[in-house]
């Protein structure tokens, strides 16, 4: 099979699986008054956030409503556990492919448990909208939603293995893109807005500018020069191609995802808590509350440092440099290298978090200026995911083409 046809088949296979994943959202769980439920949750902050990842599945309660969320949550938990539990860390680092397969299997079991819990919570949550709520309905809905989530997880792994790109990321990308037309129409083609065309044009310009800035920051790196013992013996001039790249935004989209999920919780609690004092406190942290933006920025900063500490360990970098016989010019190997890298990472993390602040606040600023109330669905979380997945997929296609060229040259 030729290189072009193989790539084309992978792309077609990926698109086919994405279409299958999308169709399942429109197959409703039986026994629910879906019209009444949709009317009730249309303005719910928590549901709107979850819809970003499910493509509107939480508004319709389709069999694929949970989407890839349980698998992603389980993957995040496993990332944390591999840093905390020594046996899991050893399994990941020292046992090679077999160890990674075991961790993947544990992640799947966690995803199954997570999906079951979420399905049970949803079956209780929709109780007011169920025609005949009983134990049989709970079992049926839990089985349908959990099975749907497991099918999505399977499709995700198929895309990663036999298609092109990362399956989980592409599924989220598809769900976000599917919600953009609705957000645009709700925002700009409502009769209550004056000068809709002008506001639409202004928003498109700002949105494109945000995309350009996001690409620049997502691709931005700090290059730290390194030199090997072999180079040091040959020349005093540093090789410009020998450097350690540290990304400006190490955490990627995860800090803002965690922060957004946390900030959606107060809005959900206001619907189930009756105490007036607690309600007044919770309203301060709701989207229109006086402390919302302050806490939002603080959480983004916290999760940026937290996630960077998980994905980038200065001690591991220093050890690997020592094993390779390389060092940073004018920095002694060992603890001095660790301290130097930690300072650099702290500065980069602060700059990356500041960028996330800016992108996260722009939708709120536009809403205040234009009085358009539906822009947060097009905000920082969605934008960062869209740009990040698009860049990553393009790089994977490029890498695949290059690897195939090398394979054909060596045959």
Swiss-Prot record:
GO cellular component: chloroplast thylakoid membrane
GO biological process, one term: protein targeting
Localisation: Plastid, Chloroplast thylakoid membrane
Membrane-related topology note: Multi-pass membrane protein
Transmembrane segments: 11-31, 52-72, 111-131, 135-155, 163-180, 197-217, 253-273, 291-311, 349-369, 377-397
PROSITE patterns cross-referenced by the UniProt entry: SECY_1, SECY_2
Annotated keywords: Chloroplast, Membrane, Plastid, Protein transport, Thylakoid, Translocation, Transmembrane, Transmembrane helix, Transport
Domain of life: Eukaryota
Function: The central subunit of the protein translocation channel SecYE. Consists of two halves formed by TMs 1-5 and 6-10. These two domains form a lateral gate at the front which open onto the bilayer between TMs 2 and 7, and are clamped together by SecE at the back. The channel is closed by both a pore ring composed of hydrophobic SecY resides and a short helix (helix 2A) on the extracellular side of the membrane which forms a plug.
Family, as annotated: Belongs to the SecY/SEC61-alpha family.
Subunit structure: Component of the plastid Sec protein translocase complex, which is composed of at least SecY, SecE and SecG.
NCBIfam families for this protein: 3a0501s007
Protein name listed in UniProt: Protein translocase subunit SecY
Species in which this protein is naturally found: Pyropia yezoensis
């Amino acid at each position: 099979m030729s290189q072009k046809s193989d790539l084309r088949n992978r792309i077609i296979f990926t698109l086919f699986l994405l279409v299958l994943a999308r169709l399942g959202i429109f197959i409703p769980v039986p026994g629910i008054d879906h019209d009444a439920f949709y009317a009730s949750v249309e303005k719910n902050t928590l549901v709107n956030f979850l819809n970003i990842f499910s493509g509107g599945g939480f508004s319709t309660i389709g069999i694929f409503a949970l989407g890839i969320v349980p698998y992603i949550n389980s993957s995040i938990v496993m990332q944390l556990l591999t840093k905390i539990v020594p046996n899991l860390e050893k399994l990941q680092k020292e046992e090679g492919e077999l160890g990674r397969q075991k961790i993947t299997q544990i992640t799947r079991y966690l995803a199954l448990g997570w999906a079951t819990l979420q399905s049970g919570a949803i079956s209780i949550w929709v109780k007011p909208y169920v025609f005949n709520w009983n134990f049989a309905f709970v079992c049926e809905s839990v089985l349908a939603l959990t099975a749907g989530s497991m099918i999505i997880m399977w499709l995700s792994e198929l895309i990663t293995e036999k298609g092109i790109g990362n399956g989980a990321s592409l599924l989220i990308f598809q769900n976000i893109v599917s919600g953009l037309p609705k957000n645009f129409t709700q925002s700009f083609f409502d009769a209550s807005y004056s000068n809709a065309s002008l506001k639409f044009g202004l928003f498109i310009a700002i949105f494109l500018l945000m995309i350009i800035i996001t690409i620049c920051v997502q691709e931005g790196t700090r290059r730290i020069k390194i030199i090997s013992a072999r180079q040091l013996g040959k020349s005093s001039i540093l090789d410009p191609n020998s450097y350690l790249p540290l990304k400006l935004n190490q955490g990627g989209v995860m800090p803002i995802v965690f922060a957004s999920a946390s900030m959606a919780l107060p809005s959900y609690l206001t619907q189930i808590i009756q105490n007036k004092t607690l309600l007044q406190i919770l309203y301060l942290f709701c989207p229109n509350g006086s402390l919302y933006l302050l806490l939002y920025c603080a959480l983004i900063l916290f999760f940026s440092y937290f996630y960077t500490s998980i994905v980038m360990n200065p001690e591991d970098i220093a050890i690997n440099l020592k094993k390779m016989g390389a060092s940073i010019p004018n920095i002694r190997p060992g603890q001095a290298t660790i301290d130097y890298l930690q300072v650099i990472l702290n500065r980069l993390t602060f700059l990356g978090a500041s960028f996330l602040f800016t992108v996260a606040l722009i939708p709120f600023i536009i809403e205040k200026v234009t009085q358009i109330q539906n822009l947060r669905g097009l905000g920082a979380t969605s934008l960062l995911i869209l740009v990040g997945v698009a860049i990553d997929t393009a790089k994977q296609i490029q890498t695949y083409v290059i690897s195939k060229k090398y394979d054909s040259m060596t045959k």
